[in-house]
Amino acid sequence: MIKVGIVGGTGYTGVELLRLLAQHPQAEVAVITSRSEAGVAVADMYPNLRGHYDGLAFSVPDSKALGACDVVFFATPHGVAHALAGELLAAGTKVIDLSADFRLQDATEWGKWYGQPHGAPELLKDAVYGLPEVNREKIRQARLIAVPGCYPTATQLGFLPLLEAGLADPSRLIADCKSGVSGAGRGAAVGSLFCEAGESMKAYAVKGHRHLPEISQGLRLAAGKDIGLTFVPHLTPMIRGIHATLYANVVDTSVDLQALFEKRYADEPFVDVMPAGSHPETRSVRGANVCRIAVHRPQGGDLVVVLSVIDNLVKGASGQAVQNLNILFGLDERMGLSHAGLLP
């Protein structure tokens, strides 16, 4: 049994991680931390987990207790893993970080987007970007895994086949993305209130979103050259979900794009390339660790439209973290993640 610790279990990604691990046959949560909720039983905080964690309570972070775990997940705001990851790695504990702390390879770039100096630049050389569809073999050997963000997951998986094949003009990529309100986190904020977010949709961070450098980094590696990306996120009145509408100009219109995407993801357990002409819906992946993709070429021209949907809390966060856990410990990649999407 894999002994698991979780730092920061009171946010949406934390409780989703608890939900998924409760059904994992090879993982046992031994430690879960929260300074604000120390002493509170997990089952009291989250009634949906009654019967799964009845003996587990939140505790103040303790390096010794966390260091005794085989793996520690960080479901925390940025900056927290900087302070604790090094000590855990020195103790031989694996780290899977759901925050943005180790996603960018450039510490200076990270500081520019997150408004503070990188707290552990010496660890960046050890960090593996945890997108299994790209870095599976590196994940197997990793000590420190940086779980991709929600927008970056949906966007990269949608663009990858085109860029890897050299088909897309990398200088003219557009990602028009929509997110559910849970993507903003569980903290109290006016913009997340029901009366503010309900029955409305808006774009935000058009000037530049923190996920932009992460997406650009991944697409640049896929293309093998510099890329030009316009990324516009939107807030929509739903709880869960990411819908990415992606645009690229292709340099060869004779290629069968449906076949290209199907071949690229044929062996990927959590990427579903839908039949030609499909329009994937966010509700089809709610609660599931799946990215559903459809590729279109309207009017038969050189403009390609890729539709990519995920649950931002599952394939966009906690589910992908568990997928990384399975790969890291040599388990079946699908273990604990074979949930169908919730309908209605």
Swiss-Prot record:
One of its GO terms (molecular function) is NADP+ binding. It catalyses: N-acetyl-L-glutamate 5-semialdehyde + phosphate + NADP(+) = N-acetyl-L-glutamyl 5-phosphate + NADPH + H(+). GO terms for cellular component: cytoplasm. GO terms for biological process: L-arginine biosynthetic process. It comes from the Bacteria. It is an enzyme of class 1 (oxidoreductase). Pathway: Amino-acid biosynthesis; L-arginine biosynthesis; N(2)-acetyl-L-ornithine from L-glutamate: step 3/4. It is found in: Cytoplasm. The active site is at residue 150. Keywords: Amino-acid biosynthesis, Arginine biosynthesis, Cytoplasm, NADP, Oxidoreductase. CDD domains: AGPR_1_C (cd23934), AGPR_1_N (cd17895). HAMAP family: ArgC_type1. This is N-acetyl-gamma-glutamyl-phosphate reductase 1. The gene is argC1.
